[in-house]
Amino acid sequence: MSSIHCFTSASFAYLDRVRVLGETLKKHHPDWNFWLCLSDQEPDGFSFELDREPIDGIVRIEELGISSLQSWIFEHDVVELCTAVKGQMLVRLLEGGADKVVYLDPDIAVISDLTDIVNWLDDNDILLTPHQLIPDIKRKAIIDNEMASLAYGIYN
């Protein structure tokens, strides 16, 4: 088993994006294990066959060991929920034997090799990529971006 694991966190509404992420990740890193942390259940009548997906494994929110799960879920909207499970999923993969773990948002397409990230993890315990590096100056951008950063943080 590869010691490099990559995961994303999403609901079924984002499954199409997760597929693009998985397909493009596997194109550049076929030896990485790609995981989906799934925050909800399949809709009625939906058929989901893992062996036909570019995903090596799925961990459902119920498998993360979150205490009082139903009340915890109730406190979050779907975006917050997909964000809130990242820490527990990271711990699960590391405790499961992963040497290195990369998280990618589900709406990402990998367009080039990510080996530099893996190499940086040789010397660093964690790497963070902020949503913003340069302050916005236009009013609309400030409202859309700066206010969101104040509300949710630049790392989510």
Task: Pin down the residues of each PLM region.
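Glycosyltransferase catalytic domains, chiefly GT-A lineage
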Residues: M1-N156
